[in-house]
Amino acid sequence: MFLIFDTETTGLPKKWNAPISDSANWPRCIQLAWQLHDNNGKLINNNSCLINPNDFDIPYESEKVHGISTALAKKNGLDLNEVIELFLNDLKKAKYLVGHNVKFDINIIGAELYRLGISSQFNDLHVIDTCTELTANLCKIKGGRAGKFKFPTLIELYDFLFKESFDQAHNASADVEATSRSFFEIVRSDVLSKKDFEDFNQLNNYLKSNYSSKISLYGLDHVNLKQESSKLKQVSTNKNIEILNSNDKVINKNPFVHLHNNSQFSVLQSTSRISELVKKTAEFNMPAVALTDKANMMGAFHFYRAVKNFNDDDKNQSNKIKPIIGCELNICENHNDKSHRDDGYQTVFLAKNKTGYQNLIKMCSLGYTDGFYYVPRIDKEVVEKYFEGLIVLSGDKYGEISNKILNVGEKQAEEALKWWKSIFKNDYYLEINRHGEEEDEIINQLLISFSKNHDIKLIATNTSKYISKEDANAHDILLC
């Protein structure tokens, strides 16, 4: 028999080659769907289960892909033990395990079995993958490695075989039906052969005698997970965020200062000239401005000199600017580990005195001399050594807290926040961003909650990469 299965998860692993015993590396399974077919391809059993996330939550970016929210999974999900038991009962009947990019799904279920203390159940099964060089050469989609054709996604393979799309891609239930249909079609059309699996001839003969053209759909109904999740959404993501009017006394009393600015010294990332940054700061009557270039402080001297020249001008004596020197560093797990790519989280450091400035220089240098791997990096051990005299901002959506909210989970984001506060105490701040992106509202709601629960101050920052609205196009060209 053939068991064809697919999973939906909380995200992707950091290390694709990590063992399944590395539970922190492998994301959690939140939907498991499978079909059991007999040796002639007839559908024997079909199942699709949401899994109740008892000890984790489903991050926003993952929900955007498959539509399964934490609320939906808690409402309709079964316990992991129950789902695994149902799956293993059918798995025991199978000789062949089939999937699209099936190694990932095997690792996901293998990691869940490990968490439950159950030994791997896949060792005795013959694995058949519909995402290989064989299907790559069938679809002939350019863009693969070393000039080869790229491995097709399930959508691309399905479209090539049947000249049609399938509804609800990334719903494991729909993906399994599409994978099943694709698998039996490439058997029927002799894309696979006897060398690919032992019982090919029997299945091939049956399919050819019963399907004169393409393999048909199985007529299964699939729940629209995105619609179901949307029904459970709160009325407004803004209901807990108080927006003050521009003439509010609080705003007038506390003038805004830009604390997260990149300049042209953030190579290929920003079009801002330091002279224009200082000029615009003065134009808006801001009392201070920060320079926080990416992983380097080459612009610090030019920045300080530009501000000093402005302040030394007699006509500016009543409108002096305070220069704040900082840097945006990449904080990874282990800056000495170059066995896999880990760019880390982009974190903003500001020097509040000379000691902080010197420590920031040291950390910045170590990122290049010791930690460079794709990008300059340091780790939290380095931060603990050189934290004195520094202020830390949580960063934008690429900072650790915000990134974990979007891609890992609320609990993990909160644990990371606790670490930063334990080191920097009152010199740690949470950045509220409003870039007009949907993600901002998701992040801001939780940051406000974290701020209240952990007594951490919020600051308003938008990541500045160009000075004027007219420079936006030039910045886009730079990134391309």
Range-by-range predicted roles:
Residues 7-15, 20, 264, 467-468:
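Short acidic, Gly/Ser-rich segments with clustered Asp/Glu that frequently serve as metal-coordination loops
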Residues 15, 25-70, 88-213:
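Metal-dependent phosphoesterase core characteristic of DEDDh/y 3'-5' exonuclease domains
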Residues 1-3, 255:
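Extreme N-terminal starter segment of soluble prokaryotic enzymes
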Residues 67-78, 144-145, 259-272:
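Glycine-rich phosphate-binding "P-loop"
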Residues 75-85, 409-415:
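Glycine-rich, highly charged phosphate/nucleotide-binding loops
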Residues 1, 31-33, 346:
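Conserved beta-strand and immediately adjacent loop positions that scaffold enzyme active sites
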Residues 21-26, 339:
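Short consensus segments that form the blades of beta-propeller domains
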Residues 128, 212, 216-480:
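Phosphodiester-processing cores and adjacent nucleic acid-binding clamps
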